[in-house]
Amino acid sequence: MHWSNNNPNAWGDPGSWLAYGPMWAQVSMTPFSQYKAWLAEGGIRNALIVSGPVVKRPTGSINRGAMHVSDIMPTLLEVAGTSYPANYKGKEVPPALGKSWLPMLEGRVESPRTDTDVLAWELFGNRALRQGNWKLRWEAKPFGKADWELFDVAADPGERRVRDGDQPVDAVLP
């Protein structure tokens, strides 16, 4: 049997592995449900600190706008004053995903997303869609029901109350 070397002096060395396990992972994401590797808010909601000359928001301000990792490249391109190429070495490049955060960083909008934008995730067979405050999530058992569940993440960021009976899914997500 091989045990990883978790001595603090060896952190980051080959053979070291640091993790505090699922129960502490859940504690670290309180009040959200679940943690990394899941599509509940605890797995996809993150803190991000941004600083620099393009940030015009008040110091210490908190923004709760919906953002996605796919937004990073469009943001960096816009800050750099350049654009995403349509082709490279004579080959067409697929369109970039994501939206620039620059209008949000400059304090002109609260989110790069509108209420009609849809974000989608798939990870390890689990999947989720979000539009505005509504989130439709399917997660495998034992953490999920292996069925679609609808949540209002603005009113219930911990995803404790399934809203399937309150709002028809086709009225929420087109």
Label each region the model flagged.
Residues 159-163:
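Carboxylate-dense, calcium-coordinating segments in secreted/extracellular and ER-lumen proteins
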Residues 52:
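Conserved residues at the C-terminal ends of beta-strands
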Residues 13-44, 55-65, 70-154, 158:
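C-terminal cap/loop subdomain of S1 sulfatases and analogous C-terminal strand-loop tails that border
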Residues 1-11, 43, 49:
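Metal-dependent active-site segment of extracytoplasmic phospho-/sulfohydrolases and closely related
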